[in-house]
Amino acid sequence: MPLPLYLLAVAVCAMGTSEFMLAGLVPDIASDLGVTVGTAGTLTSAFATGMIVGAPLVAALARTWPRRSSLLGFILAFAAAHAVGAGTTSFPVLVACRVVAALANAGFLAVALTTAAALVPADKQGRALAVLLSGTTVATVAGVPGGSLLGTWLGWRATFWAVAVCCLPAAFGVLKAIPAGRATAAATGGPPLRVELAALKTPRLLLAMLLGALVNAATFASFTFLAPVVTDTAGLGDLWISVALVLFGAGSFAGVTVAGRLSDRRPAQVLAVAGPLLLVGWPALAMLADRPVALLTLVFVQGALSFALGSTLITRVLYEAAGAPTMAGSYATAALNVGAAAGPLVAATTLGHTTGNLGPLWASGLLVAVALLVAFPFRTVITTAAPADATR
């Protein structure tokens, strides 16, 4: 894989830390800003909503911009939003900062996905996506637990400042990795925007996006509210939140690595194995959450299965959107973040009921069940190469 691809993954790691770090900070933010844990959890949905709106919008605006300038500008805007968020005492201002950061993240990821696809041959897109998404999984392994520890010791604001600072080496990497003159397809004779937007009418693309959104909704429903499960249900100390996040991240890294090698050639096998296992795993986690060893083991397993299944579906989005070279990345980003926005909202409705802290885990199982029910009648469609794929 080309070196620029790995340097893009460094930037994705910095941004991924921010996207996932709230899983360990929600109780602290709620206490500091005087809101409920459920309300603080909606910061994840606010971020995801910004990603949904920002991905296609910013990608469309950036079609004629040089890729390096676009990526660099997005990183710097992302850092600035975190600096402001770290200093605020207002929850609405913090929400606004998360939305702005999400818009910048969306623009970066949309352009980065398209750039990554352009750096490799067509039959290597799954592996290229795995390298890029490894930045997210490294964030869950190291960045998010590190942020949680920093938040435990110095408060959640220190974690926001740390993310802002970590963006600087990522910006330097983009500055050195991406040639200044490399523009998007729109500036080099690619299809017009209306043609790329027309790809959204393709049933195969819409199906892949829907399934990716449902699986990611299940992931974020549980991940956002994992901290209370670790401390209250399992009875572990606050530092074990970071351990759980490390295990989830390690699992996600393993899952996306294995799926990256299989999703180009054997997507059907990945979906057939990971889907049912993921469905069983969420209820199992809910029923065994009061047993620390079982809880931590299943957190690792669910991280692996969630990212294996999710990354394979997003690879299918990129394949199905082959006729939209500058917008394909935004479609994949939007699909991921529709799920990231919906998941915590669905999970928040289960808090305070008879299921208590375990409600989000049951909600995740329900979301995966819906995904499998939707996918089953179209199982051959989602894993069969589209005509555009077959000719590449």
Curated annotation (Swiss-Prot):
GO BP terms in the entry: response to antibiotic
Main location: membrane
InterPro entries: MFS, MFS_dom, MFS_Efflux_Transporters, MFS_trans_sf
Compartment(s) where it occurs, according to its Swiss-Prot or TrEMBL record: Cell membrane
UniProt keyword terms in alphabetical order: Antibiotic resistance, Cell membrane, Membrane, Transmembrane, Transmembrane helix, Transport
Molecular functions per Gene Ontology: transmembrane transporter activity
Transmembrane stretches, start-end: 6-26, 42-62, 71-91, 100-120, 129-149, 160-180, 205-225, 239-259, 268-288, 294-314, 332-352, 358-378
GO cellular component: plasma membrane
Record's keyword annotation contains Signal: no
Oxidoreductase is among the record's keywords: no
Superkingdom assignment: Bacteria
Membrane topology: Multi-pass membrane protein
Family label: Belongs to the major facilitator superfamily.
Name of the protein in question: Chloramphenicol resistance protein
Record organism: Streptomyces lividans
Lineage: Bacteria, Bacillati, Actinomycetota, Actinomycetes, Kitasatosporales
Gene name in the database record: cmlR
